[in-house]
């Protein structure tokens, strides 16, 4: 069987990680790297024997695509790929606005194109073991995700950091809905007006509660998930330094989604992207309102 030709949109640090995963696969080969910065695209592509370009033409001739460019560019790239019929793995957040996220998802649904969001923690072995250990016996979920500030970002701490844990909450209690959200922020950045630390509490329709904290201005790194069961037993794990490679596991799932999943399974994958983005939007609006009306 011939290798799947992969188009990589973006040439930054996250794109480089995806390139390494593709390069290690026996069933895929990196065909082209697309970036507006052609020198950067060439630098990354040359490491894997791929072509480089600043336009999407070559990408549209590939079999599957990974979108790992800056967040503001996600929507346009994804829509062009979807209209060409290419299965797409798009880094989180899916786009820079809830409106654009819905448009991308609805377009993929209309054309029945496989779409996956890069919620890589879903594939973290530590999280999978924790979820298996507790099953559905959950009373409260607590997450902490802190670390140093990224060199540059086009996303808020909610879209860039907290959204991972919002997604994990929905993975732990599938089908549940949020009935109450309370959010607070601190450490507002003077240059972009965004907070660097966010805490959030959730109440679900089932009565399950969750507390989440995200910070990207800490000298230390923590990625912890704790689950308290109805009998008050607590199960905790760290998501740092997983025993496997979550990004590689995610790419394997993307392969299955693109080649073997049924329409029902593709529908479910697409549907699972929206809840965390909708909740992130609610939190962002709460924080903005609180700052404007202290």
Spell out what each predicted region is.
Residues 1, 64-67, 113, 205, ...:
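C-terminal helix-rich "cap/oligomerization" subdomain common to oxidoreductases
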Residues 149-209, 215-220:
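Rossmann-like dinucleotide-binding domain that binds NAD(P)(H)
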Residues 1-48, 136:
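N-terminal Rossmann-like dinucleotide-binding module
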């Amino acid at each position: 069987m011939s290798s799947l030709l992969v188009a990589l949109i973006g040439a930054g640090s996250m794109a480089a990680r995806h390139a390494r995963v593709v390069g290690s696969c026996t069933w895929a080969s990196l065909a082209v790297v697309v970036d507006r910065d052609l020198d950067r695209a060439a630098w990354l592509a040359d490491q894997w024997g791929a072509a480089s370009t600043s336009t999407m033409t070559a990408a549209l001739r590939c079999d599957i695509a990974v979108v790992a460019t800056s967040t503001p560019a996600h929507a346009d790239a994804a829509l062009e790929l979807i209209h060409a019929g290419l299965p797409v793995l798009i880094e989180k957040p899916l786009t820079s606005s809830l409106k654009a996220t819905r448009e991308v998802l609805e377009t993929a649904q209309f054309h029945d194109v496989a779409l996956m969001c890069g919620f890589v923690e879903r594939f973290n072995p530590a999280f999978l073991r924790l979820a298996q250990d507790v099953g559905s016996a959950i009373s409260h979920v607590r997450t902490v995700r802190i670390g140093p500030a990224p060199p540059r970002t086009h996303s808020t701490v909610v879209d860039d950091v907290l959204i991972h844990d919002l997604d994990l909450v929905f993975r732990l209690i599938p089908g549940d809905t949020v009935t109450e959200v309370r959010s607070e922020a601190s450490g507002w950045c003077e240059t972009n007006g965004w907070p660097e630390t966010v805490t959030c509490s959730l109440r679900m329709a089932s009565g399950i509660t969750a507390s989440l904290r995200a910070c990207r201005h800490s000298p230390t790194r923590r990625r912890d998930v704790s689950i308290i069961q109805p009998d008050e037993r607590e199960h905790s794990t760290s998501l740092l330094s997983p025993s496997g490679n979550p990004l590689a596991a995610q790419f394997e799932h993307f392969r299955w989604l693109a080649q073997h999943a049924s329409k029902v399974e593709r529908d479910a994958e697409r549907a699972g992207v929206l809840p965390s983005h909708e909740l992130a939007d609610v939190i962002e609006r709460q924080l903005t309102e609180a700052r404007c009306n202290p």
